[in-house]
Amino acid sequence: MCCDVLIVGGATSGSFFARRMAEQGFSVTVLDSYSENKIGSKYDIFHMCKRDFERFGLPSASKDDGTWAFEFSEGLTSSPYGNFPKTTYDTVIGMHMHEYVLKMNRWAKEKGARYIYGAKYLAPIFEGGRISGVRYEKDGEEKEIFSRVTVDCSGMNAYVRTSLPDGYGVENFRLGGNDMFYVILRYVKLLREKDYLNGSCGWPYYKTWIAPQHDPHGAILGIGACNSFSDAEEIYKKFEENISLPDHEIQYFERGTTPYCRCPYSFAADNFIVTGDAACLTKPLNGEGITSSMVHMEIAARVLTRALKKNRTRKEDLWEINTLYNKTQGADFCFLRAVLTKAVNAKADEWEYFFANDIIFSEPLMNAVSTGEEIPLTPDVIGNMVKSIARGVKKGVITKDTLKTVGGGVLLAISIKNHYLKFPASPDGFEKWCKKADKIWQKIGKMQ
């Protein structure tokens, strides 16, 4: 069996990329390890901004087909003690994940994409030193499929990327416990009508939030923490001690993980592309990755289309995926990730000062992140941020250690963003660029 584009992973990222390539007239095959009645069942509910349906040309959610669950337009982000809320206005659609993934599968199939469900990825196939397909298992039988280009959309396990040999062109690292968020979702019933939700609220100090769910009398209380689910539960206890939550009863829990680390430096190698959670393309502020991955895939689809038409799919021919992404959303995300990684070391009272003085958590920044616009981080904005922290030290509300840590984090954020803006236009100089990036990321460290 042969095709132009082979995609491993058929959920949101795999389906989006399949549609993009199939509508260009290429033969596309999608493998997914889950059966058709289980695909996209990691969580029941997920959210997407309404404007992103038009932005990415996605099929709309509908009550008629069971994809639509609810809708809200106001989001709040509050301090550790529930003060100084920052408001974002962006209509959000809540959807049933399994049903919407199936709809995206059908959407890709409309343009000719072929899906093979229950196909467990085994290993890449190489010919002449380049990937030319994969081996997989279905119904207990080992099979092979060949392709001009293989795309890893297999989620955070990154089955294809992590099975590539060292030095192939894309890093093959696996995620450790401090490279991801451990997410616990409490689906709850709200006991008082006055507490029914018409929007969401987040408390980034605890990495917690409350949002509507499919039951209009209910809510989802979520937390994402590094290292382990037990750490998440310990932080949730502190959250409950400091934030007054509406009276509620637990209905059920969902647990999962999402990447929270830097992306591979390169997303492309000979006959190969990695994207989605397999490439750690999640938003620094909340760990979500569906639409941020689509930004990357729009770039990848354009570059790959040109490469396939020229019948040239070497690393050099796909390199523009790296430069276009790393110099735009990639650079902005690196800046935010660096700042937040250092900011989490501040104490709750210091975060209160951050919120009161629009340090990091300002409405312009929050709205830019929400809408996907360019993040307003001009030199003046950054300079005022550092000055505000320094004033907090003089007032005795910010410790000198926090000034050093957060201020140093801002400087590292500037350094890593500027470095990504200088991403090499070709593989020449890439190794040298990586060595410097490694040094900066080592200083930034991991989220705690």
Segments (PLM) and residue ranges:
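N-terminal FAD cofactor-binding segment of flavoenzymes
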Residues: 33-76
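Glycine-rich FAD pyrophosphate-binding loop
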Residues: 6-8, 22-42
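N-terminal Rossmann-fold NAD(P) dinucleotide-binding loop
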Residues: 14-15
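Beta1/beta-strand and adjacent pyrophosphate-binding region of the FAD-binding site
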Residues: 1-11
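C-terminal helical "tail/cap" subdomain of flavin- and related membrane-associated enzymes
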Residues: 305-448
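FAD/FMN-dependent oxidoreductases across multiple families
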Residues: 121, 227-301, 307-309, 313-331, ...
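Predominantly flavin-linked oxidoreductase catalytic cores and closely associated redox partners
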Residues: 10, 111-245, 280
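Short beta-strand to alpha-helix junction loop
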Residues: 87-106, 159, 226-234
